[in-house]
């Protein structure tokens, strides 16, 4: 048990260093927060974070995406025009596809936890090295589900 603790801590430290070296605040902060939680009595909250963290993250992301509508930065006129421009219609179609893939990804990650480690490593590498954003595991899992037929 103690050996597993140290292995997981080392992995988090490596992720923290990768985040620092790549100047990626999301990876750096996430790894740092998880290290603090892991080495303090806050670790009792890991089951809650594991059960609800993904949904909370999606909620926060959705709030961020909808904020331009709520603040008025994206006008009603712009929203209506998005239904008549070819580029916007393609964007809507891609948004639908990505949301569908994300849904498949959540199901796959829940039903086949053995793929989660690979998806996370790929996502963290993409975030740290390619300056991506950490929405990758859901989409990657959705794409994987298409390839493996799940």
From Swiss-Prot:
<keyword id="KW-1003">Cell membrane</keyword>
<comment type="similarity">
    <text>Belongs to the UPF0756 family.</text>
</comment>
<dbReference type="GO" id="GO:0005886">
    <property type="term" value="C:plasma membrane"/>
</dbReference>
<keyword id="KW-0472">Membrane</keyword>
<feature type="transmembrane region" description="Helical">
    <location>
        <begin position="83"/>
        <end position="103"/>
    </location>
</feature>
<feature type="transmembrane region" description="Helical">
    <location>
        <begin position="115"/>
        <end position="135"/>
    </location>
</feature>
<keyword id="KW-0812">Transmembrane</keyword>
<feature type="transmembrane region" description="Helical">
    <location>
        <begin position="45"/>
        <end position="65"/>
    </location>
</feature>
<dbReference type="InterPro" id="IPR007382">
    <property type="entry name" value="UPF0756_TM"/>
</dbReference>
<dbReference type="Pfam" id="PF04284">
    <property type="entry name" value="DUF441"/>
</dbReference>
<protein>
    <recommendedName>
        <fullName>UPF0756 membrane protein ACICU_02320</fullName>
    </recommendedName>
</protein>
<keyword id="KW-1133">Transmembrane helix</keyword>
<feature type="transmembrane region" description="Helical">
    <location>
        <begin position="1"/>
        <end position="21"/>
    </location>
</feature>
């Amino acid at each position: 048990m103690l050996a597993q603790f140290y292995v997981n801590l080392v992995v988090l430290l490596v992720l923290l260093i990768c985040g620092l070296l790549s100047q990626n605040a999301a990876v750096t902060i996430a790894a740092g927060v998880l290290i603090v939680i892991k080495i303090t009595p806050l670790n009792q909250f890991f089951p809650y974070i594991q059960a609800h963290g993904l949904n909370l993250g999606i909620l926060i992301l959705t709030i961020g995406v909808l904020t331009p509508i709520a603040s008025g930065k994206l006008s009603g006129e712009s929203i209506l025009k998005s239904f008549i421009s070819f580029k916007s219609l393609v964007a809507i179609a891609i948004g639908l596809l990505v949301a569908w893939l994300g849904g498949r990804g959540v199901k796959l990650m829940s039903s086949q936890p053995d793929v989660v480690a690979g998806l996370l490593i790929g996502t963290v590498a993409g975030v740290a090295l390619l300056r991506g954003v950490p929405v990758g595991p859901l989409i990657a899992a959705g794409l994987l589900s298409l390839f493996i037929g799940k």
